Amino acid sequence: DFCLSRGLGDVYKRQITDLDNGKVRAAEKVNGQWIAHQHIKKAIMLSFRIYPMENLNGPYSSWYDKAHLLKGKTAGWSKEDHEKAGFRMVPNSPVRKGSFVGKNAVLMPCYVNIGAYIDEGTMIDTFARAGSCCQIGKNCHISAGSGVGGVLEPAQALPTIIEDNVFLGAMSEVVEGVIVGEGSVLSMGIYIGQSTKIVDRKSGKISYGKIPPYSVVVPGTLPDKNNSSAASLYCAVIIKQVDEKTRSKTSVNDLLRE
């Protein structure tokens, strides 16, 4: 109450509104490198501390959450508001205040958390999730049941980033600030976090935390070099890399077939 009475609530509310309108972002690519905007992430985290809990009653249930976020991004919108925003939003898609959705995006029944940035022409498919502060580029397809993880804390940590023209297969998860490079195709049922080994099948090189642009990635296993009888461990395998022209002309299924 003290913070709200001193006007800090209005400051944070403006920050959330700027996130909502795409004027600011939790992370951004600068000179070819992704950086986290710590002050934006801190504003989100502090807003949870200064706003009280509130109740919202509906026709079949009630909800209890922070007052400034209890109602979603599009609460009270008219048809004209939706037309101006320019994205399609299917019923039963919780999209939180403080998330940005670009024009011509399609939100099937999905979940979009605070701070998420979804660029133009991207589809978040049925029961897929866009976590807090994640950045999803233009013309991506986040397939049914898949998730793009959120990262709020620590403030300096990069959120999970999906660059332009990426296909993320059904029931997959990319989390913990992993970066998926532009034009990549990730097959169904792949899971990638910061500790996941990413193996280039052609070179044998192992890396972590980043999928290079225009990679085609499938789940795989990696044997223990020192013990042939030990259980193999999960990894993500880059089976090929293609150029932009090939990616644009080749179907996802053809790219994944070897």
Residue locations for each model-derived region?
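Structural signal for interior beta-strand "rungs" in well-ordered beta-sheet cores
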Residues: E83, F87-K225, I238
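Single conserved hydrophobic/aromatic residue that forms the stacking wall/gate
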Residues: D1-L8, Y12
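Exposed loop/turn and edge beta-strand positions of beta-sandwich/beta-sheet ligand-binding modules
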Residues: F2, Q156, S232
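C-terminal functional extensions of proteins
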Residues: S215-E258
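Generic structural "secondary-structure junction" signal
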Residues: L4, A26, K42, L46, ...
